[in-house]
Regions:
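Functional transmembrane core segments of multi-pass inner-membrane proteins
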Residues: 29, 120-224, 264-272
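Alpha-helical membrane-inserting segments
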Residues: 40, 44, 106, 110, ...
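C-terminal ends of transmembrane helices
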Residues: 41-46, 82-90, 130-140, 182-191, ...
Length: 272
């Protein structure tokens, strides 16, 4: 199976031949991931508010004062400040630290998955967009076109330099991802948002038509299970909206790691 993102599945969990150099690279990639997570926090906060993600520099959302350079160290600044602004002592959500750690861990996983190849940078782009889109959709129930356009453009660039699939597969992935959710949106009379449709279409560009089907299946199953749990616990009612973007993002990262394995097992069972 040819995918847009080349995968080296054996690199994810194989630590039997780990060297000191490998450990150093893991730490270094983890630090880079923390910094990327800090940038993603900026994107997640500012993009829905139509603010520049570059200027001005980071500031406290309570008092508006610019954050000191020493307090911009990802994750550790939140720990040292005990989760409060240095100036006004307003609480800072632990989610900032969570996103930084999440990005750091997934960056290391991507590095292992790609065995340090150039495809690592494509994987970093992927998780950056997935995390940003997932949290923005969770907060605002919106997936912004400008983010999706950038995501699609990067998918095309990745395919140009690293891809192992045809442009036809990318086009079919685009049609399959967007078409399936568009059909669901029509049949469910608005049960799916337009942003989700476009998100699935762009994922199809990155993954191709076979993997986007797996992504949609996992996202629907996971979304259904979470929905049942929320209904059972009284956290949501049948009339409440649950954003689908986070489920698509999680499913996409899962298939990025294990898509080849899943399809290989399926083909072995189906065709002997």
């Amino acid at each position: 199976m040819n995918l847009v993102l080349p995968k080296k599945q054996t690199g994810v969990w194989n630590g039997s031949n780990k060297t000191m150099g490998d450990s150093f690279m893991d730490i270094w990639i983890g630090i880079i991931g923390l910094s990327l997570g800090s940038f993603l926090n900026t994107c997640i906060y500012r993009i829905p508010r139509h603010q520049s993600i570059i200027w001005p520099r980071s500031y406290c959302t309570s008092c508006g004062r610019q954050i000191r350079s020493i307090d911009l160290v990802p994750f550790f600044s939140w720990i040292f400040l005990h989760g409060h602004c240095y100036y006004c002592r307003a609480p800072i959500s632990c989610r900032y630290a969570v996103i930084e750690v999440l990005t750091s861990l997934t960056s290391v996983i991507v590095y292992k998955n790609e065995n340090g190849s150039a495809a690592f940078f494509a994987g970093i782009l992927l998780i950056g967009f997935l995390i940003s889109i997932a949290f923005i959709d969770y907060d605002w129930h919106l997936i912004f076109d400008k983010v999706l356009l950038s995501f699609a453009f990067c998918g095309g660039i990745v395919q140009m330099f690293l891809g192992q699939t045809s442009y036809l597969n990318m086009f079919l992935g685009f049609l399959t991802g967007g078409g399936c959710l568009l059909l669901f949106m029509i049949l469910s009379h608005g049960g799916m948002g337009g942003g989700d449709v476009k998100f699935a279409a762009v994922l199809g560009i990155w993954f191709g038509w076979q993997d986007i089907l797996l992504i949609l299946w996992i996202a629907f199953v996971l979304g259904g299970l979470v929905g049942i749990l929320l209904l059972a616990t009284g956290k949501k009612t049948r009339k409440d909206f649950v954003p689908f973007g986070p489920f698509l993002a999680f499913a996409a990262f899962f298939i990025y790691l294990y898509g080849n394995i899943i399809l290989s097992v399926y083909q072995a069972i189906a065709y002997g």
